[in-house]
Amino acid sequence: ADNLGWKLAAVLRGEAPDALLDSYAEERERAADENILHSTRATDFITPKSAVSRLFRDAVLHLARDHGFARELVNSGRLSRPTSLSGCALLTEDAPRAGQPDFAGAALCPGDPALDAPLAQAPGWLLRSLSRTGFTALVFAGEAQADPVGHRAVEQVMQAAGLLQAAGGLAVVRIDAQAAHALAWRRYDARPGTVYLLRPDQHVCARWRAATAADVLAAQARALSRVPHGLHAAGVAPDADGDTAAPVAARPGVAAAA
């Protein structure tokens, strides 16, 4: 429902072409295939089809009494986890720039559902801070003087937020480098200047170590199934059909308290 709901809303508001709805099949068929796979494995475990499978099942049940790893084989919980959409068409894959670290140590990748973590500012949790109707940019930064890279990332994302006010908007959540945010920084493998772009259904659709406004605009255009022209000129963003729209004056973004 979340996957289809935000796409229908974007099309009805004129923020995306009808083609966005075609992505529902690609993304939900993947989830269905994953659920069928896990259900089949669970059924095979409950009713073994061979002597070897029965021996494995009985051994796991015996070990599960005393060992946690065996209990996870009995109840993996996989059917309660959101499906990763990694590799789907609406995502912007990583494209590290020269001199910038990659995301090799990150637990998340484009397509994965966002992870929660406590935040110092209201409402107190990362997922509760996300926009319920539009895209959200998570910007990891410190104080401007001590963290010029993170400060530039904030400026670039806020510029993109201003340009996107005419096309659905962009909420910006700044996550400062403080002890209360340590878990968020760790879960997102964040460094000063790291930016994650999240869809309305809370899936990661792009991420950067140092994003530009054009990066954010192009990634959102791709996530909305528009031709990702990005910025053709300063202050010019693609419209809902992927064509170049009229210049849009930069306006303040929607930002959470630092």
Where on the chain are the PLM-derived regions?
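Helical substrate-recognition/capping region of FAD-dependent monooxygenase/halogenase enzymes
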Residues: 10-258
